[in-house]
């Protein structure tokens, strides 16, 4: 269960989610209001409506401040300079030029990969960077077969789109 303070801004405009892979903004989505009385649904479960869009400069700056704070904390606690594979920062405008931080998702984040044309490719690239970066650090190097795109590299690992797991 997550408990958040009620904000009229959420009912009026919804939220903006900024999705990061390996510390780099991948994409942003706008989540439409869901619980406002004007939201009509006949289902008991409300479908979340998300639309990909470019974040405003202020949204980007706010999200980047949050991401940097998380990265700094990880460095201080772990002693390692490492970015999270993924995280999501949800913000809502406060109507005065600032933002409310609504949620930071670090573990089970909804990444809205289907809402953004580049989202899935960016996530696959982030995973490939981790896998091949780790292999290079362990002396394995990077595979040379293929065109260099993510799908070709994943295919070498047996994880490409044409593989079926049993």
What annotation goes with each model-predicted range?
Residues 160-164:
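Short, intrinsically disordered C-terminal tails of secreted or membrane-associated proteins
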Residues 8-10, 79-81, 165:
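Short, solvent-exposed secondary-structure boundary motifs
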Residues 1-76, 92-95, 100:
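Phosphate-binding site of ATP-dependent enzymes
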Residues 24, 57-157:
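ATP-dependent carboxylate activation and anion-phosphoryl transfer catalytic cores
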Residues 147, 165-166:
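Serine residues within intrinsically disordered or low-complexity segments
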């Amino acid at each position: 269960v997550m408990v958040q303070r009620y904000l009229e801004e959420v009912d009026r405009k919804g939220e903006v989610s900024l999705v990061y892979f390996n510390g780099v903004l991948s994409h942003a989505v706008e989540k439409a209001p869901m619980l406002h009385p004007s939201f009509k649904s006949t289902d008991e479960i409300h479908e979340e409506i998300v639309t990909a869009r470019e974040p405003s400069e202020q949204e980007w700056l706010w999200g980047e401040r949050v991401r940097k704070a998380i990265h700094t904390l990880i460095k201080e606690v772990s002693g390692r300079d490492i970015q999270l594979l993924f995280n999501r920062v949800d913000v809502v405008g406060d109507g005065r030029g600032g933002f409310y931080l609504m949620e930071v998702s670090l573990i089970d984040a909804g990444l809205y990969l289907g809402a953004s044309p580049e989202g899935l490719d960016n996530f696959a690239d982030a995973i490939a960077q981790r896998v091949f970066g780790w292999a290079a650090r362990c002396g394995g190097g990077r595979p040379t077969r293929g065109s260099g795109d993510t799908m070709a590299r994943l295919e070498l690992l047996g994880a490409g789109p044409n593989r079926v797991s049993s």
